[in-house]
Amino acid sequence: MSNLLVELFVEELPPKALQNIGISFADQIYHSLVTQDLIEPPSELDAANPSPWKWFASPRRIAVWIRNVTQKAPDKQLAQKLMPASVGLDADGNATPALLKKLAALGADESAVSQLKREHDGKAEVLLLDRTVRGATLAEGLQKALDEAIAKLPIPKVMTYQLEDGWSNVNFVRPAHGLVALHGNEVVPIRALGLTAGNRTQGHRFEATQSPIVLRNADSYAEQLQQDGAVIPGFKERRDEIARQLEAAAGKLKLRPIEDEALLEEVTALVERPNVLVGQFEQAFLAVPQECLILTMKANQKYFPLLDAQGRLTNKFLIVSNISPADPSAVVGGNERVVRPRLADAKFFFEQDRKKTLESRIPGLSKVVYHNKLGSQGERIARVSEIANLVGTALGDQTLAAQASQAAQLAKADLVTDMVGEFPELQGIMGRYYAQHEGLSDDIAYAIEDHYRPRFSGDALPRNKVGMIVALADKLETLAGLFSIGEKPTGEKDPFALRRHAIGILRILTEGGLSLPLNTLLEQTLSVFQHEFDHDTALQAVEEFIFDRLSGSLRDQGYSVQEVDAVLAMKPQLLGDITKRLEAVRAFASLPEAASLAAANKRVGNILKKSDSAIEAAINPALLQEDAEKTLAQALAQVQPQAQQAFAAGDYTGSLKALAALKAPVDAFFDHVMVNAEDPALKTNRLALLATLHQAMNQVADLSRLAA
């Protein structure tokens, strides 16, 4: 066995897709060869060779190196099922035309009929043919693997280009100019994209010391490309080298590069051999908010801005160049000249935007369409402002309500600024800067920036209570409004990110300290919409959607399905209490009485559901005849007030633990008392007793959900 190398040499690949293309290319070829028995899958990974294959991807190549590939797959002995015997043989046992046709397709003739086996496959008697299937040669198997890999590449867009013959067209992500296929030091004769495989590749476009590079064997690929081609072909190795150079260059200046994994990945896909250089710009540009400058340098120029020890932007940045000239001044100077107009534009936008107040921009939002059924952004901020005022009022703080209403009115005003028009990623951030420039309070300024939070999993919540209220109002308005017009997520499609908005609402209510009932919030939110819709249907749909997200979130936090179902079955409206309820349920489940009480609770619930009698609100002591029902009534009279008092105080664990005293009387009741007594009065009274028991047991959670 020898190692295998396959490389496809192309024009510059799309940088954001490069990593996925490289991994897919290698993965498809490797697994296709495994399927064809041309590779033995390793039973154990060798510490010195931790993977049986390695992928390479640089701007102009994708490649795969595979260990221990055989020249030919072994032949296989197969007992191939042909067809039911009733179809293949006539009444006299002779072969039918259908059987002869099948045999001919497999390369056998009529003489093979006598050698057929008969077996029962569980449905009918079938005919089997013992045959030898020839194993594929490496050339055959690799051709198949390469064709499949190319067809399945995750290519964002394909282009059509003409081959050198002048009339053949090929569809691929970029024009391909070379194909390498080496098994050890032997070329594997395969073709793809109009190319014939060989052992020659190209190095760096400008800095290779040899062109072409004649590869000695499959194992020398990376080494020869680095030494003779000035290329680091491994994506990870190139990324690590860039990270090392960034840290080293920043360290010499006693600064640190901004951390951005996405930018690092993109730059890795843009260069073949990195060379990090230091550039700088005029100090005057630092008067512009650093978020603007950072975004300009990252998004447009792929530079790494440098920060000081306090995290403040400096006027220096790092350039990841694809060339290493003896005198880098021309490269650095060119990059500095290119970035200067970008920064000047940002400075101009910032200065122009500050000439108008945020409030003066609000009328402009009426020209920004939000949704054709829900109006403009101007109409939307009016609704969000009203919801924010209602939330602040519900919290009992009119000053807070007024601040939240004002912040909500201004929250979207930066959407019509020049800076946000150029860089939509800065919405909210620029609103905060402009609010501070106008002299508005930090509470309002930070609320404008933070009302988008949390934007993603793990994101921070708004920094102050005003921000919490505006963020909550914004997300409630989005969710309720879109549900009211039937724009619900379906399957994996969620174009308006409503799942993310629901998670944001949950996090603000559970972590943000806003103790407000969810149903009240939803009712108030829906009340601000003027269009016609079914209010009750929308309310129920939004509430169910939020509770579904809550259920998944709680399970992700480590609570069991039974614990979550038990608590959420009660539809608790104060979401901040849910964790306490879950901990109480967990503590209750550990009690020795828990299993019996949960089972009894389930039984009680079923009895009450099936009852065709009216259930009285109160128990009549005079109708308690059996000792067991009297004992249960007495126990309830003692336990229920204790459990209720603990529940009212928010001591959910204490409330559930108080129920433990009911185990013995509940067990005795079901052992000795017939609920469906012949006397209607006794039956009704016993149902009232069970209803009281059910109510006492199901305040914190539906304990029947814990029953096995």
UniProtKB/Swiss-Prot annotation:
Primary site of residence: cytoplasm
Entry EC number(s): 6.1.1.14
Stored Pfam families: DALR_1, tRNA_synt_2f
Molecular-function GO term, any one: ATP binding
Keywords: Aminoacyl-tRNA synthetase, ATP-binding, Cytoplasm, Ligase, Nucleotide-binding, Protein biosynthesis
Assembly, per entry: Tetramer of two alpha and two beta subunits.
Protein name: Glycine--tRNA ligase beta subunit
Species whose genome carries this gene: Methylobacillus flagellatus (strain ATCC 51484 / DSM 6875 / VKM B-1610 / KT)
Encoding gene (name): glyS
